[in-house]
Structure formats: structure tokens, C-alpha cells
Amino acid sequence: MVQKANPETKNISTAEINKIRQKKKVLSLLHTNGHTSASELAVSLKISLPTCIVLLNDLIVSGYLKNIGIGESSGGRKPTLYALAEDIFYVIACDFARYSANMAIFDCTNKFVSPVVQIDTHIDDPQLADKLYLAAKKLMADHGISGEKVLGLGVDMPGLINAKAGVNYTIKDKKHQNIGRDLKQKFNKTVYIDNDARMHAYGEFQFGAAKRYKDAIIIHWSWGLGLGIFVNGQLCSGKNGFAGEFSHIPMVENGELCICGKRGCLETIASSNTIMKRIEQGFEGNVISTLISRFKDHPEKVTPEDVILSARMGDEFCISILNEIGLALGKGLSYIIQLLNPEIIVLSGPISKAKQYVLSPIQQSLNRLCLEKISESTPIVISDMGDQSALLGTSEMIFQKVFAEMNFTDAKQLIEIESPIPIN
């Protein structure tokens, strides 16, 4: 169905090259904006309106676009609106938790076209690539989606990840660290690998509480503290893609040992790990707590979510734990706020669901440690995207990667837009 250009494309004219390039830009703009008019597209593409209409008509005939009706007029004739055909192409997104992964298929308008399925795997699973491949094939088959219409696969996972190389350096077995290469060999499509916290942040930035802002900080607060940094609308990844390791900034001299091998990291005093350590100490010390009483026969079954629920029911011990980690995170955020002066900070992840039980101590730390003029203009809000931010962020990122790779400058690499949408 989809073919890369054959050697004959080297004879393609400059005019045809420009036309193909413009069509690709139309697809990218409509994916980003949802729908728009010919005049708005012409302005964005810096081409004449008649030229733009020719491009749109070609894409409608090819089945990529559709006319969705008449828009509002700002004066004069009401414009015709255009949008992508929903079923023209898809991407698969996969979001890793600690001991499982969630996968779903999205259409070109970023809508779920499949339920989220859970895969029993983890980043050190030697069968990881095989399991993701089989799960994706089954998901596509179950929902009648042809592999020819799938542009690519996006995967977010914990670890030190070089997204450009597709390498996760946290995977213990070095021969499996290049997970991007392994998945590309399985899928034979574009594959994008990135850190889970960055994709949570990208989802929030594109679709959630940070959508209207250019300078934003998004914290995914769970077993670690993942950080997404947006400056002037751009996601900051750093030289090798390792930016945002907020969990491992040093906070306590000679503090508790962190999983990274260092002592006193923020993660040791402000994460789900901290919550579970305090609960363990509570059981050992016979602390008075409804939570301790409820789980006295099965202390290993307590989760951070149980602690938050008990705090909402007035359990003072659980409230004190959330207060402790909120104060610690607030101290960490004080450095971020004074260094970057963001427009907004968004808290996502399981611990953020504690809401006022962590927001109040965070603000208390900021009041004590930050310059007032800086901190008073930085709102801290709780995400309302739940567990969907990473999947949505990853799906959008793979779309953007595919569209970026479609901007070929060498005629030999061109893919004919008159045939269906390209995949790798």
C-alpha cells in the first residue's frame, strides 16, 4: 500500500518536489490544529490561496482530507473548513509503569481507537521487544486496523534515555539497551523512545493544564520525581536527552541511600518510596493509625493510594507523612522556580491526587525558601489528565517525529503523497 520512492524520483522536477513538501506540511498543520480554512493554511504555508486550494483538492481526492462544513466569518464570506480523515493513519503508544506497560492505538486526531491494554513486562525483560510486538499486532487485529495505516510506535519508559539514539542506559543488560533498534527491527516502522516523565510532561503541555503556557514545569510524582521542562514552548532534553532527573538532586548530606547509588537524593525524602518507608516504620512502632489497624495482618499490601485515602478520612499519621513529603518537594521546587521562573508548575502522578494535603506544605516551603516576587507569580496546579497524559504525549510525539521525517530535501528520498501516507 505504501511505498518509498523508487530511483525514478531523482528525475522529479523542483515544482513537484515543492508540491509534495507543501502537502506534507498541510497534513502536519491539520493534525496539530484539528481543522482550519484554506485562507489560514495559505498564510501558514506562505503560499497563495489558489495554490492552497489546489493542494487541498488533491488531498481530498486522495482520501486524506475531508470538508467538514462552514466556519464562522470574521467579515465577508464564511470559510470552508478542512480536516484530516480520521481513519487515514494511526500510531501505537506504549507507557511503562514499574512492572507493566499500557498500550493503545490513536487515530490522526489523537483519539483513542482502542481500549488501553496492559502488558506483563518491565524494562529489563529480555523478551520486551517480542512482547510489545505481539501485543501491538493483536491490538491492531482486534480493531481491524491494517499495519499499512500505522505510522509508527512510541514508547515511554523509566530510565536514562537518549531519545535520538533510542537507547535506555538504565536497562541492565547492555545488549538490550538499544530498545529503539530492537523494536524497529520487529515493527519495520518509525519508533520513538523517550523517558516516561518527559512524555507525561509532553501530554500535559499539549493537552492538559500546561497547554496555554510556553514556560512550564511538569512533575510526575510517583516512585520517582520525573521532571519535564518547557522553555519558550520547547521541551528541554539536554545534550544527551537526560535533562529532568529531578529525583536525584542532592538534598540531604549523608542521607538515605538512593537506588541510584548516591545518598540524600530528593527521591529518598519526597516520593512513594518515602511514604512506604514511613508506613513500615509505623507498623514497627505501633503508631496509632486507622491505616495501621486496617492492614495489621497484611502490611505489605499498603499502597501510597491507601495512605492518601486514609489522610482524606482524617488519619493524622497519614496526613503527617504527606505533609513531610510535601515540604521536601517544596524545597526542591524552590530551586527550580528561582532558576527557571516558569509560568506554571503542574503536578501529575499518583501522589498529586493528595491535593491539598501536599499543596499546603509545598506552598509553606516556597514561602520560606523562595523570593516572594518570583514564587507569588508561579501557580502550582494538579493535573486532571489522570493516567492518560503519557500515552497522549507519546502518541503526539511519534506523530511529530513522523511528520518531521517527511520533510525530505533530497528528491531520492521523497515519498509520493499521491499514494497512501508513508511509513518506515
Regions found by a protein language model. Name each.
Residues 83, 94-97, 210-211, 218-221:
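Short loop/turn motifs at secondary-structure junctions and domain boundaries
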Residues 212-270, 419-424:
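Glycine-rich phosphate-binding loop of actin/hexokinase-like ATP-binding domains
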Residues 62, 109, 164-165, 232:
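Residue-level recognition of short loop/turn positions
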